């Protein structure tokens, strides 16, 4: 398995669940702030159009693919990797570690509805998890510095972001140097709390996969010329 890949011109790490967890553990031991993000086809396509999103994705310490279609596009979706992605193996294993280690979690999202759903899910599935704070960007007036102050006052171990892209990437890019935490985990909007795809969303997912395949093919043709 290739550990560093290029998808539609974007350089990303391609490690399995246990390799990613080992990388995180090593950074924790060295007291190094670690950035993690779940990446799907929509995120890749956004990065094609937005240089700031691409910059953030390429700077991540750990990339977790949340759709097998990303690896399908470059022929790297093995049976094992596909199973990991479909079972959300990284998310579940990581959250179990967070819960059992007693790490504190700060949840940041765009709206109160998403925050409430995620909080309830974590309480149901990881009952011993310590949520030290939460915030919805839609409820904040003016600059985001109040959020940064709140985060740094609480000094959580994990910042769990359920912000949608590209808001998530732009927030991380702007405020990463200011954050007092051990780990930033950008899950993205709608990926927690058992959210199901609507028929319309399933159609869009197939469309994005076809578009991503086109970008990959164009990249190969450019390399050959």
Which role fits each region the language model picked out?
Residues 62, 104, 157-158:
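Structural motif
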Residues 151-165, 181:
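Proline-aspartate-enriched helix->loop->beta-strand connector
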Residues 71-144, 150, 154, 225:
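Conserved beta-alpha
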């Amino acid at each position: 398995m290739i550990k560093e890949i290029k998808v539609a011109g974007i350089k990303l790490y391609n490690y399995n669940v246990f390799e990613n967890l080992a990388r995180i553990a090593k950074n924790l031991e060295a007291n190094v702030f670690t950035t993690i993000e779940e990446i799907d086809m929509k995120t890749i396509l956004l990065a094609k159009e937005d240089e700031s999103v691409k910059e953030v994705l390429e700077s991540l310490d750990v990339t977790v693919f949340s759709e097998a279609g990303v690896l399908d596009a470059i022929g790297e979706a093995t049976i094992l990797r596909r199973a990991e992605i479909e079972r959300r193996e990284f998310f579940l294993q990581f959250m179990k570690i967070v819960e059992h280690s007693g790490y504190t979690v700060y949840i940041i999202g765009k709206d109160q509805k998403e925050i409430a759903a995620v909080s309830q899910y974590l309480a149901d599935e990881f009952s011993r998890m310590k949520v030290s704070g939460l915030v919805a960007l839609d409820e904040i007036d003016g600059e985001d510095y109040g959020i940064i102050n709140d985060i740094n006052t609480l000094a959580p171990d994990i910042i769990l972001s359920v912000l949608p892209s590209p808001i998530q990437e732009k927030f991380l890019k702007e405020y990463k140097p200011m954050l007092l935490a051990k780990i930033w985990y950008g899950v993205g909007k709608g990926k927690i709390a058992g959210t199901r795809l609507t028929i319309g969303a399933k159609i869009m997912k197939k469309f994005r996969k076809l578009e991503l395949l086109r970008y990959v093919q164009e990249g190969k043709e450019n390399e050959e010329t």
